Amino acid sequence: MLYKTWEHLYISLIAVMAGILAAVPLGVLLTRMKRGAGAVIGIVNIIQTLPSLAILAFFIPLLGVGKIPAVAALFFYSMLPILRNTYTGILGVNRHLLESGKGIGMTAWEQIRLVELPLAAPVIMAGIRTSSIYLIGWATLASFIGGGGLGDYIFIGLNLYQPEYIIAGAVPVTVLAAAVDYMLGMTERKVTPDGLKSIKDAS
């Protein structure tokens, strides 16, 4: 049980970390693209409506079965909420603050690092939080292509008509999702600038 729980968490963590590293820079880049950004976000929204099992099945002809295609599929899925929230969060930064940054001689990179990302951090973290919780649930389907994790118990239970196996897989997944949601909620609170915290508290 402990091994399967760790395996499940490992698959989810690798996928979401890779998703963050890919989606945040891409989201920032899209805010610099006057043309095409809306189309990309629209495609992302459409892809997110596809069944996760279909995405997993899509990677089988490309990468075979096992942990690698499972992580690849989960990585692909993890990018979507993070990319959308990064794009939305950066666009939501007050333009007057950016003009002020230019006025004091900030480079484009300094504006991103010191102004845009800190102010967009709560929205980006909300995307990471959503993505992480989704992935913990979706990772149960990794068992379908030999990726392991707690989904193994669920699939065994379904195949053998043994509800205790289903419970043995479903309960830890629920606990993991709740724990990750709590921890990322605390992180989201910490990365929120004090000024934004005051606005939220007042509302």
Residues covered by each model-derived region:
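Generic alpha-helical transmembrane segments of integral inner-membrane proteins
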Residues: 13, 17-25, 29, 75, ...
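Transmembrane alpha-helices
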Residues: 13, 76, 109-141, 173, ...
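Glycine-rich helix-loop "coupling/hinge" segments at transmembrane-helix boundaries
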Residues: 61, 138-167, 171-173, 198-202
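Short cytoplasmic-facing helical segments at TM-TM junctions of multi-pass membrane proteins
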Residues: 85-124
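Periplasmic/extracellular loop-to-transmembrane helix junction in inner-membrane transport proteins
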Residues: 1-15
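Alpha-helical membrane-protein architecture signal
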Residues: 2, 36-39, 68, 72-75, ...
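C-terminal transmembrane helix and the adjacent membrane-cytosol boundary/short C-terminal tail
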Residues: 34, 91, 167-203
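Cytoplasmic-entry segments and transmembrane alpha-helices of multi-pass inner-membrane transporters
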Residues: 26-58, 74, 84-88, 92, ...
